[in-house]
């Protein structure tokens, strides 16, 4: 996957074709981005193309949706959820290309229900800042200076300050005003921590503390986390 993506990203013809899969507003401003930003955006476009090609697979699961998907092939051919599966694929592609990534979740501004939409942030080492990428909408946010925005920057300008949203984007259901870095409520044993230290979740979100990407977005990661949590509870509860 990474080799195929790399070949398209470096060729002129491949870059031109991939850019057509980007959201309208991102495609218009693509040339304003620096080389590093263009590379990650083209990798985003590559995964967006895979997502569109496999749209017919979504909803036709060969296994129950709640069962974990363990590898890229599983997520490509039998996605457990479009945004989660393709965010994992983009994350692994970026990691293979030498980038650091982290998941960002978006909640509903109506009821603050989490896990409504998954996006990711990639660390740009040359620019020394995070940039948020959305695989399903093939979108990234560009500021007035032509630089990719981070999720926190989008949150700060959410509403009146954000104009370049993709078509059919539901601002209430997928709200950056309700973004989070890790859904700590799903982590085994976190309820005990929250009871002992009220506001722990809010503190962790404010300080951008997140579980490693591989734990949050892979079946192996969650099984390992559950096993660790169960073992920790067995040790803590007797005390």
Model regions: which residues?
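Juxtamembrane/start-of-transmembrane alpha-helix segments at the extracytoplasmic/lumenal side
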Residues: 208-231
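Hydrophobic/aromatic-rich core segments of domains that either
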Residues: 88-161
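Alpha-helical transmembrane segments
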Residues: 229-239
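Short capping loops/turns at secondary-structure boundaries
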Residues: 76-83, 109-113
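A structural signal for well-ordered alpha-helical segments within the folded catalytic domains
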Residues: 41, 81-88, 92
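Extracytoplasmic/lumenal ectodomains and periplasmic regions of secretory and membrane proteins
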Residues: 138-210
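Secondary-structure boundary elements
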Residues: 2-81
